[in-house]
A protein has these predicted regions:
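Conserved active-site and SAM-binding loop architecture
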Residues: 1-191
Length: 191
């Protein structure tokens, strides 16, 4: 399969597909940190989304995709999309950054590809686009951590947990300013 892993400089997902024998390429505006420049496209992913394109990997080798990608996996930046940062727009943060991030996300959702997975935390895309097909947790896949991760899928099945472990510890953060507390409840941050 020809696989495009968008917004991935670490190459972890790309390497997993390569290990299974697929022609996978990571693409990010940053240099790759995974040690395989021959699999990394450093640049804008948007001209590549619909396939039928030529590109150069970070090692200088030219490649081409004659048809559509068989699979696109995208990790668009969540800075302006996640719920945790939405308060900043009420404090004067440029709202256009949010709209640009939504538009970027939607480029992946609307790409000419039969199989697409878009990953992002809980945020505005649940209302701006649609609810995710699935919300997963690291502890369902062998990592003792809690972090709700949304998956928007096209043509793909839901992920099945492969190694359920303890959810990990949580840290309780208490807002000590009574005026800001709602019904004197603590705010809990889990990870």
């Amino acid at each position: 399969m020809d696989v495009l892993i968008a917004c991935e400089e670490s190459q972890r997902v790309c390497a997993a597909f390569r290990e299974k024998g697929h022609d996978a390429f990571s693409c990010d505006i940053q240099e790759c940190s995974g040690g395989h420049p021959e699999w990394h496209i450093q640049g804008d992913v948007l001209p590549l989304l619909d396939g039928r394109c030529e590109f150069k990997t970070a090692d200088g080798t030219r490649h081409s995709i004659s048809d559509r990608w068989d699979l696109i996996i995208a990790h668009p930046p969540c800075t302006h999309l996640s719920s945790s940062g939405q308060w900043a727009y009420k404090k004067g943060k440029d709202i256009n950054l949010k709209y640009e991030a939504i538009e970027f996300f939607m480029k992946f959702a609307n790409a000419d590809c039969k199989y697409i997975a878009i990953e992002n935390p809980i945020g505005v895309m649940s209302t701006e686009y649609r609810k995710p097909n699935q919300i997963i947790q690291p502890w369902q896949f062998g990592h003792k951590a809690q972090k709700s991760t949304c998956l928007w899928l096209k043509g793909l099945p839901l992920l099945t947990p492969t190694n359920i472990v303890d959810k990990g510890e949580f840290v309780e953060w208490i807002d000590k300013k009574p005026a800001k507390r709602k019904d004197k409840q603590s705010m809990i941050l889990r990870f």
